[in-house]
Design a protein with these regions (language model features):
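Accessory RNA 3′-end/elbow-binding domains used by RNA modification enzymes
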Residues: 1-132
Length: 132
């Protein structure tokens, strides 16, 4: 595990990418990157630091850059979503794919979009899925 602060330029570039890709709505004083290796792949977790809190913002999986679910649930970013009913919730939490019968609401999205899976009652994100 390796932690470091991003330079001002690196932080600015990352925040611009998050604003463009995921509609980030909050500024941060600093960005920390945590680097680790998981199953022979280098993973980076970007953490936003403000005067009051530290929030995981995004995860760089080398082939894919995704928002952190915690940041989505704090409404710091916006992505397309599907809401699922309570009957589908345990299956999704155990790794099942999202199927049409469990979907009760959707936003506009296209094939190959990254879509957040939200539970219907509290509207919290529980998973991310790439549509194919």
């Amino acid at each position: 595990l390796y932690l470091r602060y991003l330079s001002k330029r690196e932080s600015r570039e990352l925040l611009e990418k998050l604003k463009k890709d995921f509609k980030l709505v909050q500024e941060f004083d600093h960005i920390i990157v945590s680097e680790t290796v998981l199953k022979d792949k280098k993973i980076k977790i970007y953490i936003g630091v403000s005067s009051t809190e530290k929030i995981p913002l995004a995860i760089d999986l080398v082939e894919e850059f995704i928002p952190a679910i915690h940041a989505l649930n704090k409404d710091l970013m916006k992505i397309n979503y599907v809401k699922i009913d309570q009957g589908a919730l345990p299956r999704i939490l155990n790794g099942a794919d999202v199927m049409a019968p469990g979907i009760v609401e959707t936003s506009d999205f296209k094939i190959n979009d990254l879509v957040g899976v939200r539970e219907f009652e509290r509207s919290l994100y529980i998973a991310l899925e790439k549509l194919s």
